[in-house]
């Protein structure tokens, strides 16, 4: 009786895999023959330009990444400033209180 159950489970798994693979093929054929507003190839490979193989940029064309490539989908942002603190941040010390330790820390970094 256990042997029949194993066979039934194997048949069920095979049928599920067949249906799943059929759906993938069907979706691929629909994608291939449908019209879309964007190209289907998102990731573009940088191909070396054989005429410029001796240059410093390793011969890659600047037009290998047209605006419709994957990098065109990313939002444009402002450049990120350096993470090091500026002089303006270092001018302000701790506020002076009545204790001696706070007086030391307030004036120690200004020297």
UniProtKB/Swiss-Prot annotation:
GO CC, alphabetical: extracellular region
Summary of the tissues where the protein is detected: Expressed mainly in flowers. Lower levels in buds and seedlings. Detected in vascular tissues and in hydathodes.
Signal sequence region: 1-27
Region (Disordered): 46-65
Predominant localisation class: secreted
InterPro entries found in the cross-reference section: IDA-like
Domain of life: Eukaryota
PANTHER family: PROTEIN IDA-LIKE 5
Protein name: Protein IDA-LIKE 5
């Amino acid at each position: 009786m256990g042997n029949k159950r194993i066979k039934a489970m194997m048949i069920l798994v095979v049928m599920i895999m067949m249906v799943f693979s059929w759906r993938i093929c069907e979706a691929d054929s629909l994608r291939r023959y449908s019209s879309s507003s964007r190209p289907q190839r998102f990731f573009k490979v940088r191909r070396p330009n054989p005429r410029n193989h001796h240059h410093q940029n390793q011969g890659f064309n600047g037009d290998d990444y047209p605006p419709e490539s994957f990098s065109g989908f990313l939002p444009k942002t402002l450049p990120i400033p350096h993470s090091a603190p500026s002089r303006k941040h270092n001018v302000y010390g701790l506020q002076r209180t009545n204790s001696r330790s706070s007086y030391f820390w307030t004036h120690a970094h200004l020297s």
